[in-house]
Amino acid sequence: MQHNTNVDPQEIAKFERMAETWWDLNGEFKPLHLLNPLRLNYIDQTAGGIFGKKVLDVGCGGGILSESMARIGAEVDGLDMGEEPLEVARLHALETGVNITYVKNTAEAHSQDHQGYYDVVTCMEMLEHVPNPQSVIKACCDMVKPGGFVFFSTINRNLRSYVETILGAEYLLKMLPVGTHDHNKFIKPSELIELVDNTDLICKDAVGITYNPLTGIFKYTPRVDVNYMIATQKVD
């Protein structure tokens, strides 16, 4: 099986069309900008600090998380299959003076010559956009050093997540373009843990994220019934 087969061309095209608005704080990616400080803090705190560490951001898109990790001292590589988002990411990094290496490649292909290379790997809101999440998770595991951390975020699959992320965020609040998400591709925490358990990763922590449309604020929650992140660590 070729490594580029774990790509959904429609998903790539979807984010290519939105690339030019990636760094518009009030544009289509506003939710990612609002959510990013929580993600960055969770990654930095759970991994024991990422300053000076080699970090790979899988599915980096336009570089929102990648840049924030680089700003606090991580050595960041960003990986994506969308050429337009990567061009936006490279340009923005030049404008802001942040040193990041952006690569157009799949996680599976990149892992071939980066076995045990990174201290931390992040894979945020990406698993629900690929045909084979297990393949991506394995590649992330292969690329992190023993004892290193891999972080995943995705969306639970249930009635509440459908109401909040699709009916609410896409149709009612217009926070995201209609069609951004496919509820059938959402992943239950139990399913994600099972996929992780098929690798040398061990789940160390899980946290939910909730959004208050009245205040426009994201915050952590112990509930993982909609958006959630998990922290995993590779067995030594």
Swiss-Prot record:
Q: Which InterPro entries match?
A: SAM-dependent_MTases_sf, UbiG_MeTrfase
Query: What are the entry keywords?
Result: Methyltransferase, S-adenosyl-L-methionine, Transferase, Ubiquinone biosynthesis
What superkingdom does the record give? Bacteria
EC main group: transferase
Q: What is its EC number?
A: 2.1.1.222, 2.1.1.64
Q: Which reaction does it catalyse?
A: a 3-demethylubiquinol + S-adenosyl-L-methionine = a ubiquinol + S-adenosyl-L-homocysteine + H(+); a 3-(all-trans-polyprenyl)benzene-1,2-diol + S-adenosyl-L-methionine = a 2-methoxy-6-(all-trans-polyprenyl)phenol + S-adenosyl-L-homocysteine + H(+)
Q: Which GO terms describe its molecular function?
A: 2-polyprenyl-6-hydroxyphenol methylase activity; 3-demethylubiquinol 3-O-methyltransferase activity; polyprenyldihydroxybenzoate methyltransferase activity
Q: Tell me which CDD domains the record gives.
A: AdoMet_MTases
Gene Ontology BP annotations: methylation
* Residues involved in S-adenosyl-L-methionine binding: R39, G59, D80, M124
Q: Name one Pfam family in it.
A: Methyltransf_23
Query: Is Transferase given among the entry's keywords?
Result: yes
Does the keyword field hold Ligase? no
Q: In which pathway does it act?
A: Cofactor biosynthesis; ubiquinone biosynthesis
The family note in this entry says:
Belongs to the methyltransferase superfamily. UbiG/COQ3 family.
What this protein is reported to do is described as: O-methyltransferase that catalyzes the 2 O-methylation steps in the ubiquinone biosynthetic pathway.
What protein name does the entry list?
Answer: Ubiquinone biosynthesis O-methyltransferase
Source species: Shewanella putrefaciens (strain CN-32 / ATCC BAA-453)
Q: What is the lineage of its organism?
A: Bacteria, Pseudomonadati, Pseudomonadota, Gammaproteobacteria, Alteromonadales
Task: Supply the gene name.
Answer: ubiG
